[in-house]
């Protein structure tokens, strides 16, 4: 994305640990696209959860347009032992009422759609099925 002129960052545990100022840059809305896992965002010990999520004056929160959830089939109850933070997506939705939420998966079943809709507190789900090759 950087080659296309889109300021982006991937918040993975290694990057966050190596560059502690990264969160400040995210909070100051220096990036147009921020990639992060539910664990990075929703663990009670994370900077985002403690400092940014509940601060509507945060430039990042104020400018947030879309939250895209990859692997959105994971909230299926049989898979939550693997990634328990996916069960907390509804908290994220409740704190970011103006953001659009989008879920993506290559293996989504009707049960997974129902689970993701419930887990992420989506009150007006628009489901688009498209196979891209």
Where in the sequence are the language-model features?
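Short, glycine/charged-enriched secondary-structure capping and boundary segments
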Residues: 1-3, 25-26, 48-51, 80-85, ...
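Conserved nucleic-acid-binding Ia/Ib motif block in the N-terminal RecA-like helicase ATPase lobe
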Residues: 1-43, 128
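Short beta-strand/turn micro-motifs composed of small residues
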Residues: 12, 69, 105
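Conserved nucleotide-binding/hydrolysis micro-motifs of P-loop NTPases
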Residues: 15-17, 39-42, 73-74, 106-111, ...
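Generic alpha-helical secondary structure signal
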Residues: 20-21, 47, 87, 111-114
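SF2 helicase catalytic motif II
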Residues: 31-32, 36-100
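Interdomain hinge/linker at the junction between the two RecA-like core domains of SF2 helicases
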Residues: 92-100, 104-133
